[in-house]
Each structure stands twice: as C-alpha cells, then as structure tokens.
Amino acid sequence: MKAIIMAGGEGRRLKPITGDMPKPLVPLCGRPVMEHIILLLRRHGITDICAALKYRPDDIKNYFGSGEKLGVRLEYRIEQTALGTAGGVKNCADFYGSEDFLVISGDAACDIDLSKLIAEHKRRSPAATIALCPEPEPLRYGLALCDREGFIRSFIEKPDWRHVVTNLVNTGIYIISPRAMELVPKNTEFDFAKDLFPRLLDKGEKLLGVPCDGYWCDIGTPKSYYECCADALSGKLNIELAGGFEADAPDECSDPECECMEHADCGCTDRARLMDRISSAFLELGADYSDGFRLKGDGYELRISPLSGCKKLRIAANAKDTETAHELAEAACLLAGELEKRLD
C-alpha cells in the first residue's frame, strides 16, 4: 500500500518553535517529527510515499531528498494555493492512481498499529477507514460516533462537554479508496472531516472507524509539544530516539528541587552552543545554556538561565494564570531532567 503524508502545515499555533521551519520539521528527540512518521510507515511495510507540501516545501525536500537514506521512495507534490486536507491529497492523484492508499499527518506524533488498520480496511472494504484514538480531553478534536459494527454514523466537530458522548477522536490517519476521492474536486479547497466524510455518509457510503491502541498526539501548541517530547523520553511514545539511547521512565525526578512550581531548579549537563528556539535548546544534544535565553509567547514567558557555581538551570515560567505557569515549568523541568540522565 502507498502512503501520502500531509506535510503542508505552517504551525502558526506552535510559534515561536516554528519561527524558522515548517511544522513537519519540528524536532522530536533529535529527529523531525515527519521523519518519525516515515520510520513508522516503513516499520509497517510502507515504503512508497508521497509528501503533500505547501509551506516552505524546499526545506522539507532538502532535508529528506529521495528518502533513500531512510529506506523509502519519497516523492513530492506542491500546492500552489491552499487546497485543504482532501484537496491536497487530490493533488497527488497521479501518485495513488487506482489503489486504496493511506493518509497520515506529517506533524503529529504516533505509534499506532498501521498494519491492524490496513487489515481491517481490506477485510471490510469501506469507502474510507479512519483511525480513532481515545482522548481524555476531546474538546479540541472531531469525535466519531460509531454503530455496533464499527461504522461511523456521524461526526461532532470540537464539541463542548455537553455534547461529548464518546472519547474517540479522529486522528487524521485514513485509508482512502479512489471512489471516495472521486467526490473531491480538483484545485479546490476541500477538507476530509468537514467536506468529504459528510458527503460520503450522505451518499450512503460506508465509513469504518477503527479504535487503535498506541500513542497519538497532535503537536499543535507549545504545551502539547512539550508533553509529547516528555512522553517520548519516558517511553510512553514508542519512537526511535536519535543517538541510539533508549527511553527509560524514571521512578522519580533526580533533582528534589525539580517539581511543579513557578520557579524550579533542574540539573542539566547539556553543553554546546546557544540555541534561540526552545525546541532546539531542550532536544538537540549539546545545547549551550551558558548565557541563558528567554521564550515569549501569547500570554506566557519562559526564562532559562544557569545557576552560578553549579551545573543547574533555573526555569522560571510566567503566564496570565497560575495553571499555565505550572504546566510550563513542569514540562520544562521534566525534559531537562530526562536529558540530564542521558547526557551524564
């Protein structure tokens, strides 16, 4: 089976992390998040891949090239105007041809069992199959309501708690048939969740929802990004970490002062050059904190500075509310603490 990676995202909500790179190139434990997706596809036997690009396409093409170094064959299709998720995939029609194919986001982290998804699709032969994951905070996502046989009857887009009747969310991982793509107009902005899937249901086509075990995270905000990085380092997210080390969840923090508070000290033996992005500073081995740095965003500020006389960092988080400040400080301390154990 072939796969199309949706990799046109700019990542506006993720700024300043995406200040000088497209969202699929945001680093996750030493590799771009899209590289982890390619490795996931390869583990499940998918090596014929096309990336649908729009924002800063040359950055992505220059990094991955033909895909040979990752053991895959990688092609690219570039949108000249915004086409939406389904429209961007339609732009790859010459790639997928007359075969069913898998669609996956290039800027979400996951270790879902794609082989199970493919097997269910082949067994049931729906117009489209959607990977569903349980989400404890489903308000930011589209929910899928399934019948007893697993076929989707309706969707609820970003509901409030009064309308949350399931915690199964649409992961944006699909297996699509060519007959479904016939409903997508060419060179027109068209979305899978908002346009194509409702239209398929209206026409009486079958949409299969497959609940999937494993990890899935939409890296859409700095908070979710930090949480995803921590999950990767702790082993909750099963990915290949750069450098050859394995994640091992600690029983407790190595520094007793490293706890959830607005001001926390956290040990770190990271040494190299000063980075201007929080993603690089925490995730690239050898970042230099000797001068410290400050990250400012909409309603929050994170300051990281060395403590004189010892190999520790002071992490100070300020935000418009205490809860956000706690979350920022906690995530930053967890990442630094995990890095310390691997760099010591």
Task: Describe these PLM feature segments.
Residues R124-P134:
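A short, conserved acidic/glycine-rich loop-to-beta-strand motif
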Residues D100-L102, A109, S115-K122, P136-P138, ...:
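Catalytic-core segments of class I nucleotidyltransferases/pyrophosphorylases
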Residues L233-A249:
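Oxyanion-binding "anion nests"
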Residues K2-I5, R13, P27-S105, A109, ...:
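Conserved N-terminal catalytic core of the sugar/cofactor nucleotidyltransferase
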Residues E246, D251-D344:
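Phosphate-binding and adjacent anionic-ligand microenvironments
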Residues G8, K54, C133-P134:
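Histidine-centered beta-alpha loop that forms part of the nucleotide-sugar donor binding/catalytic region
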Residues T85, W216-S224, L307-K311:
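Glycine-rich phosphate/pyrophosphate-binding beta-alpha loops
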Residues L25, A144-C146, F197, G209, ...:
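A structural signal for short hydrophobic beta-strand segments in well-ordered beta-sheet cores
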